[in-house]
């Protein structure tokens, strides 16, 4: 029987049977054809996976028994197990998922007036080394397969099924650097955006990067209508290098050139994430410098008050200073908002993922 392989995943990191969630519709059609089955069955399989969200291949009752047995022999549905689920006072939910090899990742469900947003993880750990973030404390263990990323959304959706709610948007801003796992991230995007997949609209999906410049050009060339964000966090090279060591490899001027290429190629505006760190990058003169950097750039700035991470030394910017920073940007014509804080009490806010678990492991 023909095995369906994805060359973008290193073989030694794969389970013996891959998750069927890792495969796009056309890839499943190919596998069906090569195994003597009708390709139209792929749409039925996708319906069972993403509309009915079954827990076993046996539940796919409009498929023949022999096909269900083939699926069972070649794939698993998911290797994610829910280890812990926490709920914040504001309704934010954090899921700790255990992977097939014992590693754990975190996924966050955020509730908004306009719907439910899921923040997914793309790597076990992170190699980028941002000096304010908990996710990078243990380094990078491995990349996730597309199916492990897709399964995060499916698992959260199944939790929402209990209250007849729906995942309405997805942000790729969890643990890891998405562009460090580029091919699997792209497969994930295509699966969740497909009308027979999770059918989440492109403009309801946001990808964020710390600034891996070659991949920004590659992503621009995809011409996807996905929302795109860059973790900027500084108005100049000196401060950005202090906060984000990646800036030493991928310089700020070169990053801004890549941003301009992306905007020209896609016609889309870009979002800049700007964490405010007390006494580091949060003064009015920093806002003036940021406005100058972003002059004539089609963009939006998200201001993020720093979240507490015990292993880090950064302090929160006072509230009145945050508003002064915002006011300065607005006066210079920069489109800007202050991000609403969510999940702070369960360590689910920006920069906090994996912090609590890592503390528990080292006790």
From Swiss-Prot:
Gene, per the UniProt record: rlmN
Does this UniProt record's set of keywords contain Endoplasmic reticulum? no
The free-text cofactor remark is: Binds 1 [4Fe-4S] cluster. The cluster is coordinated with 3 cysteines and an exchangeable S-adenosyl-L-methionine.
Biological role stated in the UniProt entry? Specifically methylates position 2 of adenine 2503 in 23S rRNA and position 2 of adenine 37 in tRNAs.
State the remark under miscellaneous. Reaction proceeds by a ping-pong mechanism involving intermediate methylation of a conserved cysteine residue.
What protein name does the entry list? Answer: Probable dual-specificity RNA methyltransferase RlmN
Chain positions recorded as [4Fe-4S] cluster binding sites:
126, 130, 133
| Organism encoding this protein | Bacillus velezensis (strain DSM 23117 / BGSC 10A6 / LMG 26770 / FZB42) (Bacillus amyloliquefaciens subsp. plantarum)
Q: What is its EC number?
A: 2.1.1.192
């Amino acid at each position: 029987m023909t095995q369906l392989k994805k060359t973008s995943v290193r073989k030694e990191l794969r389970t013996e049977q891959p998750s069927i969630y890792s495969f796009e519709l056309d890839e499943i059609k190919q596998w069906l054809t090569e195994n003597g089955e009708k390709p139209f069955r792929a749409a039925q399989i996708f319906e069972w996976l993403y509309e009915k969200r079954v827990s076993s291949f046996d539940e796919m009752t409009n498929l023949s028994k022999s096909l269900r047995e083939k699926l069972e022999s070649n794939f698993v549905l998911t290797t994610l197990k829910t280890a812990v689920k926490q709920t914040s006072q504001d309704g934010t939910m954090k899921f700790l998922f255990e992977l097939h090899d014992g590693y754990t990742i975190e996924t966050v469900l955020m509730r908004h007036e306009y719907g439910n947003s899921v923040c997914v993880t793309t790597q076990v750990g992170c190699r980028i080394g941002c000096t304010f973030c908990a996710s990078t404390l243990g380094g990078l263990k491995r990349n996730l397969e597309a199916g492990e990323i897709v399964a995060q959304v499916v698992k959260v959706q199944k939790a929402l099924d209990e209250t007849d709610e729906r995942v309405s948007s997805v942000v790729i801003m969890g643990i890891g650097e998405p562009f460090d796992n580029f091919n699997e991230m792209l497969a994930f995007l295509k699966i969740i955006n497909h009308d027979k997949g999770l059918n989440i609209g492109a403009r309801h999906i946001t990808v964020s990067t710390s600034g891996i410049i070659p991949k920004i050009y590659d992503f621009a060339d995809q011409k996807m209508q996905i929302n795109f964000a860059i973790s900027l966090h500084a108005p100049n090279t000196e401060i950005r290098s202090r906060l984000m060591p990646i800036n030493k490899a991928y310089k700020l001027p070169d990053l801004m050139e890549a941003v301009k290429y992306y905007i020209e190629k896609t016609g889309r505006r870009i979002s800049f994430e700007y964490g405010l760190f007390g006494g580091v990058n949060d003064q009015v003169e920093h806002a003036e410098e940021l406005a100058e950097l972003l002059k004539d750039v089609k963009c939006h700035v998200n201001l993020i008050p720093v979240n507490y991470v015990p292993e880090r030394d950064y302090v929160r910017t006072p509230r009145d200073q945050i508003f002064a920073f915002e006011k300065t940007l607005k006066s210079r014509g920069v489109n800007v908002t202050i991000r609403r804080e969510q999940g702070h009490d369960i360590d689910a806010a920006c920069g906090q993922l994996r912090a609590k678990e890592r503390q528990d492991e080292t006790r």
